[in-house]
Design a protein with these regions (language model features):
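Peripheral, non-catalytic segments of secretory and membrane proteins
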Residues: 4, 8-150
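Short, composition-biased motifs enriched in small/polar/acidic residues
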Residues: 148-284
Length: 284
């Protein structure tokens, strides 16, 4: 099962109104929420919007329009910004007229926790030194990850389409399945699988059932991605009008290409049906 939704165009800040401040010893507090409209936007692929310092003014994280469609090259003043690699690492450059370039680099290791949205690590400015994204007094936290625009309104972020196909005209909605693997292009995005590879899709690869003390447990292994979280969905039958019920335990992906997890279902039943639900980080 694959769930998700998209917004299009420019986004208001994704930063929490209560957890919004970074700190630098030589610059003071920096507000990532800013005025709520022009504040920082942490995206699935790139960051955009502005952060604000009372001492140096507005600092741009990027314009949300990288030349290649999915990530800033950071090789020119017209194509700069902070990239998100999808697994939490933030790399690239921010810029402010009164502070110059701010480097999101490996030594400071700026990153965002995909499960909590909390930013951590440090960013570097040649003019003011290190800026901490979290400390004992304050943290920066994003409430969501902006998927980016969807110009062709097919339910797939343009940035993901450019990443996968270098175009936005190849993948489509209405059940279109570019690689013919039985999984639609939209579902491939929601699971972050390759829409051009028929062997790459979200699927259960192993399943076993345990009965002990009249209780039932299922152990499932499925294909997984480091960019997604998962939940078990359960149904007792496939009769008309049946529904799946989600077990509200968020399962992080294991290292590697598959994840194995146990679902304890309580009192054993005559039959049960299970499926795996893929979730974008911080999605409802």
């Amino acid at each position: 099962m694959l769930l998700g939704s998209l917004s299009s165009g420019w986004a208001a800040t994704t930063i929490s109104a209560t957890n919004q401040f970074a700190y630098g010893a030589n610059i003071g507090w920096i507000n990532w929420h800013a005025d709520g409209t022009n504040g920082a936007v942490i995206g699935e692929f790139v960051c955009s919007g502005f952060i604000y310092s009372a001492n140096v003014g507005w600092i741009s994280l990027g314009g949300n329009a990288p030349d290649n469609g999915f990530q800033y090259a950071n090789t020119s003043a017209s194509d700069f910004g902070v990239n998100h690699d999808g697994i939490g690492n933030l790399r690239g450059y921010a810029y402010g007229a009164n502070i110059g370039w701010i480097n999101f680099e490996n030594t400071g290791n700026p990153r965002v926790n995909l499960q909590t949205g909390v930013l951590d690590g440090h960013i570097w400015s040649a003019n003011v030194g290190w800026i901490s994204l979290s400390n004992a007094f304050a943290v920066v936290k994003t409430d969501s990850f902006f998927p980016g625009g969807d110009k062709d309104e097919d339910g797939i972020p343009d940035q993901w389409e450019y990443l996968q196909t270098n175009d936005i005209e190849i993948l489509s909605d209405e059940g279109h399945d570019e690689d013919g693997d039985g999984v639609s292009d939209v579902q491939e995005y929601l699971a972050d699988t390759d829409p051009l590879d028929a062997n790459d899709n979200l699927r259960i690869t192993a399943h076993s059932v345990l009965f002990e003390d009249a209780k039932e447990s299922h152990i499932l292994t499925w294909t997984s991605r480091p960019t997604r979280f998962y939940k078990f969905n359960i149904a007792d039958n496939f009769n008309p009008g049946f529904t799946f019920t989600s077990i509200n335990i968020l399962i992080p992906p294991a290292p590697g290409s598959t994840t194995t997890e146990k679902a304890d279902l309580g009192v054993a039943a005559d039959q049960r049906f299970l499926r795996i639900e893929a979730l974008r980080p911080l999605s409802p």
